[in-house]
C-alpha cells in the first residue's frame, strides 16, 4: 500500500511537471506574442511552480503514510488482544473437559460396581426362583394326587365356581338396573304425557247411526210417503238411507251406517219440508242440491281443520278427503275431532322433545285419513291412508307415521312414535270413546274368564273400565318367575282373542301370608 502511494505521488508530480510545462509554454508563447516576455522568465516561473507542487505532494504523501501506519498498529493491537482472549477461552474449555472426563471415569467405576452387585443379586434371585418353582411343582403334584384333579381341571372348576357366583350377582344387578331404568322412563313419560294432556281441552260429540228430522205436523208424514209410497221410495233410492216413519210425533228418523249419505238425506228432507213441494222430480233436485251442500261442508271442515292445526300446502283433494272424517265415527268418537286432537298432542310432544312441531302436527292430522273412504276402497284404513299420502306427495315421515301408528310397520322416526302415543292418548282418555253396555259387559266377562282359565289363578277382576285386569294367583303354585311368565301369556292371549280400544294392563298379584294363633 505504501509503494502504491509513492507511485501515485510520483505520477502526480510528473503529471504536474508536464502540465506546468505545457502551461508555461503556452504562457510563454502568449507572452512572447503579447508582451514580448522572454523564455527564461517563463521557464524559471514554471520550475518554481513545479517545485512547489512537488513539495506539496511529498508532504501529503508523508501525512497519508503516517496515518496508514498508525491505523495498522491499532488493528494489530486489537487482533493481538482477540487472540489472547480466544486462547484464554480455549484453555478454560480444556480444563472443563478434563474435569468432565474425570467425572465420567468415576461414574463408569460406580456403574461397574453396581453391575457387579446386580449380577450377584440376579444369580441369587434365579437360585431362589428355581427353588420356589421346585417347591410349587412338588406341592402341585401333591395336590393333584390328593384331589384327583389335574391343574387344568382344578383351574376350570374354580373358574366355573367364580362364573356361577358372578352370573347370579350380575343377574341381580341387571334386574335392579332394569327396574330402575323402567321406573325412570315411566316417570318421565308420565310427566310428559300428563303435561301434554293437561294443555289440551277438546270437545267431543257422541255420534250415532240415526238422524232425526223434525216436522211441522204429522200431516207432513203422509206427503213424505207419497201416493203408494213413491216419494219415500225415491228418497231412499237416491240416498241409500232408510226412512223410519212411526208413531213418533212430528219426527222422521233416518237410519244408515254411512254418515255422509245420512247427512245428504237429512239436508234434502229438511229442504223438502221447508219448500213444501214433495214429489219424485223435486226430490231428485233437492238430493242433488244437498250433495253439493254437503260437499261444501266437507271441504270447509277439511280447510278449517288444516287452519286450526296451522298446516299448509296440502293438496286440495286430500283436504276434502280429510273433511269427510267430519261424518266418520270410531267407537262413538268423531274421527276428524280425534285427528285434530292427535295433531295437537303430537305437536305438544314434539315441542317437549325438540322435534319438528309442524311436521308432527301434519302427521297427527293425517294418521286416520284412510277412514274417510275405508267403506269405499278395499284394505284397512292404514293401508288406504298410506296410499293417499303417497298419491298426494306427502313427506316420508308422514307416510311412516300413518303406516306405523297401529304397529303394522316399525316407526322410522321419533315423530312416528309420538303420533302413535298421541293416538293412544286420544283414544284411551276417559270419555273419548264409548261402547254399548252389552258389548262392554260381555268384554269384561270375557276378560275375566280368559284370565281365570290359567292354572294357579284363584280369581281375576276387570277394573278401570276394563283397561286393567288384576289376577290373584296361589302363592303355592305360582312363584315370582312364573308370575312374570303368566302376565306375558295372558297379555298375548288378550291381544290374539279380544278386540278393545286403547290398552289393557295385566297385573298379577302373588301374596304370601304367615298366620299363627296365640293360645
Swiss-Prot record:
A GO MF label: RNA endonuclease activity
Domain KH: 209-269
Keywords: Cell membrane, Endonuclease, Hydrolase, Membrane, Nuclease, RNA-binding, Transmembrane, Transmembrane helix
Gene3D superfamilies attached to this UniProt entry: Hypothetical protein af1432, K Homology domain, type 1
Residue spans crossing the bilayer: 3-23
Matching InterPro entries: HD/PDEase_dom, HD_domain, HDIG_dom, KH_dom, KH_dom_type_1, KH_dom_type_1_sf, Ribonuclease_Y, RNase_Y_N
Positions of the HD domain: 335-428
Cellular localization per UniProt: Cell membrane
GO CC annotation, single: plasma membrane
SUPFAM superfamilies assigned: Eukaryotic type KH-domain (KH-domain type I), HD-domain/PDEase-like
CDD domains named among the record's database cross-references: HDc (cd00077), KH-I_RNaseY (cd22431)
EC number(s) from the headed UniProt entry: 3.1.-.-
SMART domains cross-referenced by the UniProt entry: HDc, KH
One of the protein's GO biological processes: mRNA catabolic process
Record's protein name: Ribonuclease Y
Organism: Staphylococcus saprophyticus subsp. saprophyticus (strain ATCC 15305 / DSM 20229 / NCIMB 8711 / NCTC 7292 / S-41)
Amino acid at each position: 500500500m505504501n509503494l502504491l502511494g509513492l507511485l501515485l505521488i510520483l505520477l502526480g508530480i510528473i503529471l504536474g511537471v508536464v502540465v506546468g510545462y505545457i502551461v508555461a509554454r503556452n504562457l510563454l508563447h502568449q507572452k512572447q506574442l503579447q508582451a514580448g516576455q522572454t523564455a527564461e522568465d517563463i521557464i524559471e516561473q514554471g520550475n518554481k511552480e513545479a517545485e512547489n507542487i512537488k513539495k506539496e505532494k511529498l508532504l501529503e504523501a508523508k501525512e497519508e503514510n503516517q496515518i496508514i501506519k498508525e491505523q495498522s498498529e491499532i488493528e494489530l493491537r486489537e487482533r493481538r488482544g482477540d487472540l489472547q482472549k480466544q486462547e484464554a477461552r480455549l484453555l478454560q474449555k480444556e480444563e472443563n473437559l478434563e474435569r468432565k472426563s474425570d467425572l465420567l471415569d468415576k461414574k463408569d467405576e460406580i456403574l461397574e460396581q453396581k453391575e457387579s452387585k446386580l449380577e450377584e443379586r440376579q444369580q441369587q434371585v434365579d437360585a431362589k426362583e428355581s427353588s420356589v418353582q421346585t417347591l410349587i411343582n412338588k406341592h402341585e403334584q401333591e395336590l393333584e394326587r390328593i384331589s384327583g384333579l389335574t391343574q387344568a381341571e382344578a383351574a376350570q372348576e374354580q373358574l366355573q365356581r367364580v362364573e356361577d357366583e358372578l352370573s347370579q350377582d350380575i343377574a341381580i344387578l341387571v334386574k335392579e338396573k332394569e327396574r330402575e331404568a323402567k321406573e325412570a322412563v315411566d316417570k318421565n313419560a308420565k310427566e310428559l304425557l300428563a303435561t301434554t294432556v293437561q294443555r289440551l281441552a277438546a270437545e267431543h260429540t257422541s255420534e250415532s247411526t240415526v238422524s232425526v228430522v223434525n216436522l211441522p205436523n204429522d200431516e207432513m208424514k203422509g206427503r213424505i210417503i207419497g201416493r203408494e209410497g213413491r216419494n219415500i221410495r225415491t228418497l231412499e233410492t237416491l240416498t241409500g238411507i232408510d226412512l223410519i216413519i212411526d208413531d213418533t210425533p212430528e219426527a222422521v228418523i233416518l237410519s244408515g251406517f254411512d254418515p255422509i249419505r245420512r247427512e245428504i238425506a237429512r239436508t234434502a228432507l229438511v229442504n223438502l219440508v221447508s219448500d213444501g213441494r214433495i214429489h219424485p222430480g223435486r226430490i231428485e233436485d233437492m238430493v242433488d242440491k244437498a250433495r253439493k251442500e254437503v260437499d261444501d261442508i266437507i271441504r270447509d271442515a277439511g280447510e278449517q281443520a288444516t287452519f286450526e292445526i296451522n298446516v299448509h300446502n296440502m293438496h286440495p283433494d286430500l283436504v276434502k278427503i280429510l273433511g269427510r272424517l267430519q261424518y266418520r265415527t270410531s267407537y262413538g268418537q268423531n274421527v276428524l275431532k280425534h285427528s285434530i286432537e292427535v295433531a295437537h298432542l303430537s305437536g305438544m310432544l314434539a315441542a317437549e322433545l325438540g322435534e319438528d312441531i309442524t311436521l308432527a302436527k301434519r302427521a297427527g292430522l293425517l294418521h286416520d285419513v284412510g277412514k274417510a273412504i275405508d267403506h269405499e276402497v278395499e284394505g284397512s284404513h292404514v293401508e288406504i291412508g298410506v296410499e293417499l299420502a303417497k298419491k298426494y306427495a306427502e313427506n316420508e315421515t308422514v307416510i311412516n307415521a300413518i303406516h306405523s301408528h297401529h304397529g303394522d310397520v316399525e316407526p322410522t322416526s321419533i315423530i312416528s312414535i309420538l303420533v302413535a302415543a298421541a293416538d293412544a292418548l286420544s283414544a284411551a282418555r276417559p270419555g273419548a270413546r264409548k261402547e254399548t253396555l252389552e258389548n262392554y259387559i260381555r268384554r269384561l266377562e270375557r276378560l275375566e274368564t280368559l284370565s281365570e282359565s290359567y292354572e294357579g289363578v284363584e280369581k281375576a277382576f276387570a277394573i278401570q273400565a276394563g283397561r286393567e285386569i288384576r289376577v290373584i294367583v296361589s302363592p303355592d303354585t305360582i312363584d315370582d318367575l312364573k308370575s312374570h311368565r303368566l302376565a306375558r301369556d295372558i297379555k298375548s292371549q288378550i291381544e290374539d282373542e279380544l278386540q278393545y280400544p286403547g290398552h289393557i294392563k295385566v297385573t298379577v298379584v302373588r301374596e304370601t301370608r304367615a298366620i299363627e294363633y296365640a293360645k
